[in-house]
Regions:
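Long, low-complexity, charge-biased intrinsically disordered regions
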Residues: 1-214
Length: 214
């Protein structure tokens, strides 16, 4: 896995199912939307305009936190290194990377998580959620956009800083929660105090030049 500068910071191994072998009775919906690019850009620009904080939150092993419905049971062949009795099979009760409906199950999971925390789902973009609360006459607003296992968070609510802890208390693992500096391959230079917001893809350009030996 690479950091925001393209440097490799760690190596990962992941158990992946052979989803192309799944039968029709082992899954239902497979479609999993992500936030529109215009939604993401508008959120970031509004965050800059109203001097709000902009965060990125990344769920670790996101798909593994979703629960498979009992109406579509899935069984796995023996996994190398794991011994099962001759008359037993491995029953999959959680989401697993590679299964055809893993993305959709995770989408349902993150939707339930945000809705249960008081957020409202937008009509025009189902991957946009928002919440407003008023304390002592002051209004706080939080906007969250989902992109697979990443959350883009724009907020002026001081409680947003506790979001990582809140999600972890609900059983989710968070691998990253910090102020935005790079998102979906775009470098985002945002300084609320200096009123600065710029975008660039210098890292991507450098990668292209290196691949072309230039």
């Amino acid at each position: 896995k690479a950091d925001e500068h393209g440097n490799v910071v760690k190596f990962k191994a992941r158990l992946v199912a052979l989803g192309y072998d799944m039968r029709k009775d082992e899954y239902k919906e497979t479609y999993a939307p992500v936030a529109r690019w215009t939604t993401l850009m508008i959120m970031i620009v509004l965050g800059w305009y109203y001097l709000m904080d902009i965060y990125l939150l990344d769920f670790k092993g996101a798909y593994l936190h979703s629960t498979r419905p009992t109406s579509t049971p899935v069984y796995l062949y023996d996994i190398p290194g794991i011994k099962t009795p001759p008359d037993k099979m491995i029953y999959l009760n959680k989401g697993l990377y590679g299964t055809l409906d893993a993305g959709n199950l995770w989408r349902q999971t993150v939707e339930k998580l945000l809705l249960s925390n008081g957020y409202t789902q937008a009509i025009n973009d189902p991957c946009l959620f928002y919440k407003t609360r008023t304390i002592n006459g002051k209004t706080y607003k939080t906007y969250i956009a989902t992109w697979v296992d990443d959350l883009l968070i724009v907020s002026n609510d001081p409680e947003t800083k506790n979001m990582k802890k809140d999600f972890e208390e609900k059983g989710f693992e968070i691998s990253h929660f910090d102020k935005i500096n790079k998102y979906l391959g775009v470098n985002v230079n945002y300084d609320k105090e200096k009123d600065i917001l710029t975008f660039d893809q210098c890292d991507y350009i450098d990668e292209i030049l290196q691949n072309a030996n230039m």
